[in-house]
Amino acid sequence: MAKRDYYEVLGVNLNATEAEVKKAFRRLAMKYHPDRNPGDKDAEVKFKEAREAYEVLCDSRKRASYDQFGHAGVEQTFGGAGAGGFGFGDLGDIFGDIFGDIFSGARGGQAREQRGADLAYELVLSLEEAVHGLSRTIKVPTWINCKTCNGSGAKGSSPATCPRCNGSGQMRMQHGFLQVQQTCSVCRGRGQVIKDPCTDCHGQGRQQQTKTLSVKIPPGIDTGDRIRLAGEGEAGLFGAPPGDLYVQVRVKPHPLFHREGNDLHSEVPIDFTTAALGGEMEIPTLDGSVRLTIPPETQGGKQFRLRGKGVKALRSGAVGDLICHIVVETPVKLSPEQKDYLKQFAELLKKDEKNHSPRTRNWFDSVKDFFTSK
């Protein structure tokens, strides 16, 4: 039986962040966990399916391999989902937020660090910038570690061990026959308390600041693509690891080209005499202009493909084409003299209409047959 798409299993889109993937798995885990559905084989299968999808999509290397090669990429490179050792420690991270830290005792009762939040930044590019790549400087409002206390939150000293939980960050509670652990209400799971708060950050360990970052944009990037800057998100609380910054790309519309995959498309207007007699014209591309030969009797809607004048693919390196769509323009604002010449020309065409305008003649014949057959 073929495996379902991991994104479909979790109900997230291709650009879902790690936090969104984790949130989706939490929802499914609450619904299908075997402890909540004893004896339900279908729920057990769905839980395992969701757990497998979560394992891959929350691992940046496995996810990149899956995005490029599908299930085969994960199986061939990492020995399949589950080979990385998805254990109960991972489930403790997931279920700790669901069931009020009941599962946190499985991790040895240690205080859990509160990682910094991930940030998102929308970067707007021109088509030329997206196709050729560049480095762009961005400014991101964020939280950084306080420089005065180095993120500890304590003024001129180190935080003290919490007297309530003795530094574990957890309190063991007895509910009938069930013994569970909950986050310490005094230190909020840190295992430490601050007796003399830092005056610069008021004991928070963090300060707000606008960071200036240089982002390298690879050639071939497109709307919807994301660039992950590891560790450039918000600083974690009290020295915990920082989050990541996700740069979301949006490419502005271009007046001459629109992109479909690695191909570029462009409408090329020509007058009706060039369409009838043929000619040559300069065609703009993103790498300069090229000469395009218009053969005689070219019809509107005709497409000319200029090989290798499209976009170089972000991952494979293959180069797309520029596809020129011919639009035959009807002349407007004609003078009386010009109209007379066109009428004379039209009379000449009627003498051999089947040869000069075969599609028009065939259309009229079809219309005539349609009405006479009624």
Swiss-Prot record:
PROSITE patterns: DNAJ_1, DNAJ_2, ZF_CR. Belongs to the DnaJ family. Its main location: cytoplasm. GO terms for cellular component: cytoplasm. One of its GO terms (molecular function) is unfolded protein binding. This is Chaperone protein DnaJ. NCBIfam families: DnaJ_bact (TIGR02349), PRK10767.1 (NF008035). Homodimer. It comes from the Bacteria. Keywords: Chaperone, Cytoplasm, DNA replication, Metal-binding, Repeat, Stress response, Zinc, Zinc-finger. The J domain is necessary and sufficient to stimulate DnaK ATPase activity. Zinc center 1 plays an important role in the autonomous, DnaK-independent chaperone activity of DnaJ. Zinc center 2 is essential for interaction with DnaK and for DnaJ activity. CDD domains: DnaJ, DnaJ_C, DnaJ_zf. PANTHER family: CHAPERONE PROTEIN DNAJ, DNAJ HOMOLOG 1, MITOCHONDRIAL-RELATED. The lineage of its organism: Bacteria, Pseudomonadati, Pseudomonadota, Gammaproteobacteria, Legionellales.
